[in-house]
């Protein structure tokens, strides 16, 4: 991204791991609220410091970061001019009701962050703080990235947001990988992803794109 003319800000918002138990616990129950506030505060700081152009800011994330990216577009639609939403949890209640089997030992930690699907008050908050239920608030262009083999959040969440956004006439684009899951593993897919992201940002923010077109036909050929 820096090579394409963008300043990049990676935020360790509250609730992030690797910064101590107190910092992590500060995110419990704060998804879509204070955890999101941290992203907004960091963005406003970058604007105030003259690092960021307030008219050319995008938000990007994958997995929970994809959730945060989607929430940024529906919760703070005047701040972000574009969003890239990758492999995202978009319906918190759905995710809580149908967690992947691999999460068996970590469901207690999940509930600390997002609540208990069997508690009515928690369910209400899940619905209120799920991007899928606030697509009508989106103003910025969005690029949805997903893998049809995603066994963590389930590709259907991505499909639902794309469908809803199109029905509402939103500026929505998508990059879907048939043979990828919760992330992008194949180098050919990574090339497609990098190209689409830089083209998307160039269109909506004005950065550079191109100058490596020769590698794409090679990737497409080797992928067949």
Model-identified regions with their sequence ranges:
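Active-site-proximal cap/loop segments of hydrolase catalytic domains
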Residues: 1-4, 9-224
